Amino acid sequence: MPRYTPEQLIKRNASVWTDVQIILAPIQFFFFLGGITLNTLYAYHVVQIDFFWISIAILFKTLFFAILFITGMIFDHWVYTPEFLWEDIGSTVAAFFHLLYFVMAWMGYPENVLVVEAYIAYMTYIINALQYLIRIILEKNNEKKLRVQGHL
């Protein structure tokens, strides 16, 4: 189920955004790991952690998420195009739940509710990241096929 034509693959591979994504996506994953670890340690009282660090962790995770999403808008203006629709919908849902954490914190929700909301935000990130990875694998297989056929 490839989505890219040979012309689109050439454009994608030449895009600055592709390079930015290759650098920032793993950094975002490490922020996710740190955030989910802190959230879990706090939620289960494994160690004494000030709730401030839960918010800082999701803040940095959200900032990297936003940088990746915004750079996709800036470089090549590909947001919500047919080729990237599901990735962008997934990113929008994940962004909503990441930002919802801060809205709920501002509204004064208790820490236990914010911990659950942080888990939901992290879960939407994982679902979104998994669908990205599946699509990348499919596209890499398609790209190999197109190279063998001489279309690239």
PLM region descriptions:
Residues 20-43, 48-79, 83-107, 114-137:
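Hydrophobic cores of alpha-helical transmembrane segments in multi-pass integral membrane proteins
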